[in-house]
Structure formats: structure tokens, C-alpha cells
Curated annotation (Swiss-Prot):
Membrane topology of the entry: Single-pass membrane protein
Transmembrane segments: 66-86
Organism field: African swine fever virus (isolate Tick/South Africa/Pretoriuskop Pr4/1996) (ASFV)
Location of the protein in the cell: Host membrane; Virion
Chief place of localization: host cell
One cellular component (GO) term of this entry: virion component
Family recorded in the similarity comment: Belongs to the asfivirus B117L family.
Glycosylation sites: N29, N60
Source organism superkingdom: Viruses
Designated name of the protein: Uncharacterized protein B117L
Keywords: Glycoprotein, Host membrane, Membrane, Transmembrane, Transmembrane helix, Virion
Amino acid sequence: MGYTIQLDKDGDYCWDEDPTHHDPYTQANATSHTAVSRAAMAAPHAAAHHAFHEPFIKLNLTDKNIFNGLGFILIVIFIYLLLITLQQMLTRHIYNTVQHCVKAHLDSKNLQ
């Protein structure tokens, strides 16, 4: 099946069937027995092909869902970086506290 891609009035891409494209299944000769069987095969083939391409018929370039998905990913990355920063701060705080306690313990041992 032939398709042309064009922009509609809203600036969105549209897929239209190309009328200049000649499908061998649709070129059936009425006098030939094989052409009749080809024509019988053409309808389900075209229907299945059209149904398969249905989700990709129109691409909306101004769709806000793309930006919503991008925003969600950016928020997840921001939270991940925030958690890494908090974990590093907590680790440094624990390390400094333990170091301070060990130093205080050693100082108290030296005083005895």
C-alpha cells in the first residue's frame, strides 16, 4: 500500500493513501480465475495493513503529553540527584560524628 506524508492546516503530519500507487492485488482481471482469487485476497490484506498502520496515521507535533513525559523524567532525575546529595551529606555527617567520638575517646584515655 502506498502512503504520502503531508502537513494539514494545523501543521500536523498526516498519512494519506497514495492514489498513484498501484497495488498488484487490486489490479484484477475479471476474466482470469487467478485475478479473482487475488481480488479475494486484496480486501483482507488491505484491511489488515490499514489496521496495522492505524496508530501511526497522524502525528501531532503540538502534543503536550511529550512534554509531560519529559517533565516526569526530569523530576525523577532531580529527586534521584537530591537523594544522592542527602546520602552524601548524611554519610559525611556520620563520619565526622564518629571521628569526633573516637577523638574524644582517645583524649579521655590519654587524660587518665
